[in-house]
A protein has these predicted regions:
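Glycine-rich, charged/polar anion/phosphate-binding loops
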Residues: 50-52, 225-229, 236-241
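Acidic side chains
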Residues: 69-71, 82, 90, 209, ...
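Active-site-adjacent bridging/hinge elements
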Residues: 38-45, 93-98, 216-221, 305-314
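Glycine-rich, aromatic-lined ligand/substrate-binding cores of catalytic
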Residues: 233-265
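Extracellular/periplasmic, surface-exposed regions of secreted and cell-surface proteins
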Residues: 1-171, 319-388
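Extracytoplasmic gating/loop element in the C-terminal half of outer-membrane beta-barrel translocons
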Residues: 199, 259-350, 354-355
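Conserved small-residue
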Residues: 17-19, 113, 129-233, 273, ...
Length: 388
């Protein structure tokens, strides 16, 4: 059993580049608005892009870590429990202070903001030998979150505006504030008599279009109805399992990998009839709401419709929850089968060791998504592997 703790401080140059703001930078005017007239001729001038800041420094990154390592019963059970935190100070930001236009340049970036990343990790392992078969199993799960300690917040106009802003001091980062899908219009009566106004409707609203919930109940769907729907960028949980076995030179190993509490935006894929810049395959194009007869008038309330996955002509409100999908998954990343030839077979050939093996990658994926690779960052995320 081992108990450990550590602390470290280092400089972090992430995002700082070469600090061009430490010197005055100029740009050539291309609009003919800045310059001087000499002998009746306009001479193009240059303008300062920012006031220099010679006091910029790297971020300061403080890292804290504590953990417990254990190994029991001669290695039959081992594991690690760990918690960690990284606090960064001096992140670059530009002050919102107002300066007169006569200054002729914008304010420079300063070391103003701070944030932290924190989380935990648990790993467990087991190995044994039973009746000549040796095997091992290792599992790992971790959770990570990001949080602003201090963010240069602009002044909110009211409490609602402060509520749905993402980058606010003391709040976790990367929260998706958006409109919650309530369903789909299936006929013109639903469109005509729906009990909300605002963003749910437009002149082109048709059966098959999505509608969004009036979250605050004021009868109007607008920015005040946005609320936390998901997180993005980092999964809440990452996990993996590796296992293997060996018997008389035959070995089999596999590696499973997954994530949970992770969301991606597939606006184009789920809300447009012709995704991928109009290059969608025919099956995607035809699986949409459409009139029974191609010549029927879609604006006639008596027209009959055939339902499908996609709206008839797409939906302008693609920023709602319709395109945001839970991309939690577990995937068989690698599978390998091998055989190590006995050394007695190899001596005469002068070979010390010889192992023959076959392996495969990304054989199986279990996820709630259909036809989309959950590891794809979003947008054009069609998958070419087996999805269950």
């Amino acid at each position: 059993l081992k108990i450990r703790a550590s602390y470290g401080r280092m400089g972090d140059d992430g995002g700082a580049s070469t600090y061009p703001q430490t010197a005055i930078a100029y740009q050539l005017d291309t609009d003919g608005k800045i310059g001087y007239i000499y002998n009746g001729t306009f001479i193009t001038g240059v303008s300062a892009t920012a006031i220099p800041n010679p006091n910029l420094t790297w971020y300061t990154s403080d890292t804290y870590n504590a953990g417990i390592d254990f190994d029991l019963w001669n290695g039959k059970l081992s594991g690690t429990l760990e918690v960690y935190k990284r606090k960064r100070k001096g992140l670059l930001a530009t002050s919102s202070a107002v300066i007169p236009g006569t200054v002729g340049a914008s304010l420079p970036q300063e070391n103003l903001e701070s944030d932290q990343t924190y989380g935990w990790e648990i790993s467990l392992g087991h190995r044994n030998n039973i009746a000549g078969v040796s095997y091992w199993v290792n599992g790992q799960i971790s959770a990570t979150k990001n949080r602003w300690d201090y963010h240069l917040d602009g002044q909110a106009g009211n409490s609602m505006e402060n509520w749905y802003r993402n980058d606010v001091s003391g709040r976790n980062k990367d929260i998706w504030f958006t409109y919650e899908e309530g369903g789909r219009f299936t006929n013109y009566d639903q469109i005509r008599y729906h009990n909300t106004t605002g963003a749910n409707f437009g002149q082109s609203t048709l059966p098959g279009d999505y509608w969004y919930k009036d979250w605050n109940g004021d009868g109007v769907v607008n920015d005040n109805d946005r609320h936390p729907m998901a997180t993005y960028n980092l999964p809440v949980f990452n996990y993996g399992i590796t296992m293997g076995a060996e018997w008389k030179g035959i070995d089999l190993s596999m590696n499973w990998q997954g994530a949970a509490g992770v969301y991606n935006s597939y606006d184009e894929v789920f809300t447009e009839v012709g995704p991928f810049n109009g290059g969608a395959v025919l099956d995607i194009y035809t699986d949409r709401w459409h009139t029974v007869n191609a010549t029927d008038d879609p604006w006639n309330p008596n027209t009959q419709w055939v339902s499908g996955l996609y709206p008839a002509t797409g939906h302008s409100f693609s920023t709602g929850s319709t395109g945001i999908k839970n991309t939690s998954y577990i995937r068989l990343k690698t599978l390998e089968l091998g055989y190590t030839l006995p050394k007695t077979w190899l001596v005469k050939a002068g070979i010390k060791n010889l192992r023959i093996y076959v392996n495969a990658y990304n054989l199986l994926t279990f996820t709630g998504l259909d036809n989309i690779d959950p590891e794809r960052p979003g947008r054009q995320g069609l998958s070419l592997i087996h999805i269950s």
